[in-house]
Each structure stands twice: as C-alpha cells, then as structure tokens.
A protein has these predicted regions:
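Bacterial N-terminal signal peptides
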Residues: 7-18
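Accessory terminal helices/loops
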Residues: 12, 22-38, 126-129, 133-135, ...
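Conserved beta-strand hairpin/beta-sheet module of binuclear metal-dependent hydrolase folds
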Residues: 46-99, 206-209, 213-219
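Divalent metal-coordination and catalytic microenvironments
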Residues: 54, 68, 78, 92, ...
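Positively charged n-region of N-terminal signal peptides that target proteins for export
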Residues: 1-6
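Metallo-beta-lactamase
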Residues: 73-74, 81-83, 95, 135-203, 210-211, 243-246, 251, ...
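Active-site metal-binding motif and surrounding structural segment of the metallo-beta-lactamase
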Residues: 48, 71-75, 83-136, 146
Length: 339
C-alpha cells in the first residue's frame, strides 16, 4: 500500500515542476534578482555589534565605527557624523564604562567618518610618554584629549592650509599623521597596523588588529553603494582595485569554519574574505566595461547608455541621494582618462 501511494505523489510533484518550468519566465538580466537587507541602522540610534575579541562595531552613526577595548583603554576608528557624536560616546561607554579613549584613527576625511572627531577626542586622553611641556609633544599630549591619527593628506584637507577657512574645528584635526606605508601601534596587548591604502582618495587608511584578525577599511568597501570616488582628493577606480587587492593579501579564509579574517566596511554588514573577493570582482568587471568603451572612443553618455553597472544595480545602485550610479560611472570614466 505504501508503494502505491508514493508513486502518484512523485508523479504529481514531477508534473508540477514541468508546468512551473514551462510557465516561468526567467529574467534575461541582471544576475542579482534580490536586494539583501543590510544591518545598517536607520532608526536614529547607535548599535553595538561585538565582532571578535577586543573589537566591536558601531552601526547607525553615518559610517561604521570600530572600537578596540582593553587594558590600555579604547581605540576608535572613525567617529561618525557630528549630529550623532553624543550617541556614539554613549555607545562607546557601554562597551567599557571605565575605559579611556586613547586614540582616534580617521580612515579618510569624509564628514560621516570625521564628524565626531572633536567631541570624541576631547572626551579622551592619550597616554603620555613625555611631559606636556616638552616642545616635541603633539597637541593631544599637551591637552587632555585623545590623539587623532591619519595619513598626512587627511590633515591637509581638513585644516585647509591653502588659506581657505576650514569647516572643521581645530580640535577635530588629526595631530598624529604619518606619510609612510604604515604606522604601527601596540595597543590592548596586540599589534595594530594603520596602513596607507589609497582608494577613493589619495589618503585612505585601513586598520588591521592583528591578534583579533579584524580589519577596519572605511570607504575602501561600501556594501550599500558603489565606491565614492573623490577625484579632487586623488581617488580613482584603479586605486580602489589596488586597495581591494591589498586587502585580499592580508585577509585569510578559515576553511574549517564560516569566517577567518573579518572585515568592517565603511557602511553595511560585517564581511569575510569571500565578500571582499566578490566586491573586488564587481569593481573589476565594471572598470573593464568602462575602459573598453573608452578604447572604442565612446563618450560618457554612450557608456552610461550601455549601463555597465546593470548586473549590480539592484544591490549597489542608487538613482537619488548624494552618490548615484551615474555619478560613480562618471567618476570611474574620468579617472580612466575619459574626456
């Protein structure tokens, strides 16, 4: 009896599958038919997400913020927008109520990464290695504030040294800059590397917490949009690709588990190496399409008409807001030598 019942059920499911395959119309393009929900908070609150070991991620203050908490105090990578700085401070204190903010690292100078610099730095206090009256000490060591670290060009743009009035208060400026390939710290019992990785500007940094194996990358990876390439600040699509290749060199997958090196992007969800590889391939494909159009003598309008980003627009594209798909295509086109 069991066999006689099972056979009709199998036939029924097979028939249903045949009917479905005959009636369903598969989309010709794009490859992404869905837009995954990203855990970026839009509720006006700052949310704390534990990442690994000493490292946590703050979401909801503009760009993502990274916090290392331990015996030396707190190191904060990027500070969100000015409007959210009080809530960012409260979130940091929830991680370590007695922890002192010792360092702030800016991955670039964009307002949603540096807007909270002043308030967060003034709430901290850098560890002093020399007396405050020593003329060699930085501003942060002479004052009761956390030191702000960045690549030197970030300070140059934030301080407006060409004679223009800076829109950033002086206490928000980086006071501990570097101009070499990297700056090394030993903080909270682990090596921390601040590395110069030009991408969307000429002054981007990424921060590698080596023992916890977490990398905070700022604008190098944005899981909510195409890269914000700032041509005036020395950014280019080729630099973004070079930066992503550099990131892939220092990330390691764990074949036995789901993770390995974890990556905190400038916006969007927490990533692993496979996510970065996908993002790199996407940028490479789009770059090649635009470059091919330039080689064939196409204008910017003609390249836009061919929609070189179409496959990825459901996930990363925007038609409104401060950074649209058209703006990204134009920035990539100009950075590749298009006229």
């Amino acid at each position: 009896m069991k066999i006689s019942v099972a056979v009709p059920l199998v036939l029924l499911f097979a028939f249903a599958a045949i009917v479905h395959s005959q009636t369903a119309q598969p989309p010709a393009r794009p490859a992404w038919a869905w837009k995954p929900a990203l855990p970026a908070a839009n509720d006006g609150q700052v949310h704390v997400l534990p990442v690994r070991g000493r490292v946590s991620m703050l979401v909801g203050a503009g760009g993502n913020i990274t916090v290392s908490s331990g015996s030396d105090g707190l190191l904060v990578v990027d500070t969100g927008t000015t409007a959210m700085s009080d809530k960012v401070l409260a979130a940091i204190k929830s991680i370590s109520p007695r922890g002192v903010i010792r360092y702030v690292v800016n991955t670039d100078e964009r307002d949603d990464f540096t807007g909270g610099n002043e308030k967060i730095a003034l709430a901290g206090n850098t560890i002093r290695f020399r007396v405050a009256t020593d003329p060699r000490v930085s501003d942060a060591l002479a004052k009761d504030r956390a030191s702000i670290i960045s690549f030197v060009s970030v300070l140059e743009r934030m301080s407006a040294p060409t004679g223009q009035k800076s829109k950033h208060p002086e206490d928000a400026w980086p006071d501990d800059t570097y101009s070499s390939a990297q700056k090394k710290l030993y903080f909270n019992d682990e090596p921390v590397l601040v590395m110069h990785v030009p991408s969307t500007t000429d002054g981007n940094s990424i921060v590698h917490f080596r023992l916890d194996d977490v990398v905070s990358v700022g604008d190098l990876v944005d899981m909510t949009s195409y890269p914000y390439i700032d041509l005036k600040a020395g950014g280019s699509i080729n630099q973004v690709l070079d930066g992503l290749n550099r990131l892939l060199e220092i990330t390691v997958p764990d074949t036995k588990t789901e993770f390995g090196t974890l990556v905190i992007p400038g916006r969007g969800r927490l990533l692993d190496q496979s996510d970065v590889a996908y993002y790199r391939e996407m940028i490479g494909i789009i770059r090649d399409r635009i470059q091919d159009g330039i080689k064939r003598g196409q204008t910017l309008a003609q390249i836009k008409a061919e929609k070189p980003t179409l496959d990825y627009d459901p996930r990363f594209g925007h038609t409104t807001g401060g950074w649209t798909t058209d703006m990204f295509i134009e920035a990539a086109y100009r950075s590749l030598g298009g006229k």
